[in-house]
């Protein structure tokens, strides 16, 4: 039996990640609409719980964790990643869902493909490849269709939904760029343990989620922990 190449494994991980992210968005929409959960509450508690799980997992990498904790410069880098990368990314995603729906938020997020393609071409000082041009065109078509429902002269999405969707796309680029060096150096588990806790605690101090706790039943808690375990811990862990 042939072993999977790194490229093939990457394709499968990307596809599986997309499916899990989509299901996480649907679960988030379920909590936001049915239980009237706040995007602030959902993001803060989600990140804090996921950070605790990552912290437990990182105990197997005590050397890396100990080195990071003892070096303020490394910690500051991960703190910035946790707040301006992870927290902004997840908060804008749930706000985008709350003002539209999970499908719309995901389609708007594809604009990050356009932004990343432009940044890569500028960084390497080259023209875009054919596949990159095709990706940009498809992303634009998808956003135009979801925003207008095919009626080009009309904007179906509310301004808030569009703004949060665009902010979500920008945050995806920021999150990706901020994560490259620390994850490569320390591993995704250690970096996300500190980053998730940083973003979750920071947002919790600002918003105080314990004061706006939604009344969740069994289905609500299953959806929430599904988001934490599958849509966060599994999704943010590199194989």
Task: Locate the predicted segments by residue.
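Conserved small/polar residues in nucleotide/adenosyl-binding loops
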Residues: 236-239
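Loop-to-transmembrane-helix transition segments
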Residues: 9-17, 65-92, 136, 159-169, ...
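A helix-boundary/kink motif common to multi-pass secondary transporters
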Residues: 36-38, 101, 187-188
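Membrane-interface helix termini and inter-helical loops of multi-pass transporters
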Residues: 29-35, 66, 147-158, 207-221
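Glycine-/small-residue-enriched transmembrane alpha-helix faces in small-molecule transporters
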Residues: 1-44, 83, 154-181, 202
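Loop-to-transmembrane alpha-helix entry segments
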Residues: 106-109, 122-145, 155-162, 214-221
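Transmembrane alpha-helices of multi-pass small-molecule transport proteins
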Residues: 35-88, 115-119, 138, 171-178, ...
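Specific alpha-helical transmembrane segments that line the substrate/conduction pathway
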Residues: 41-52, 90-130, 168
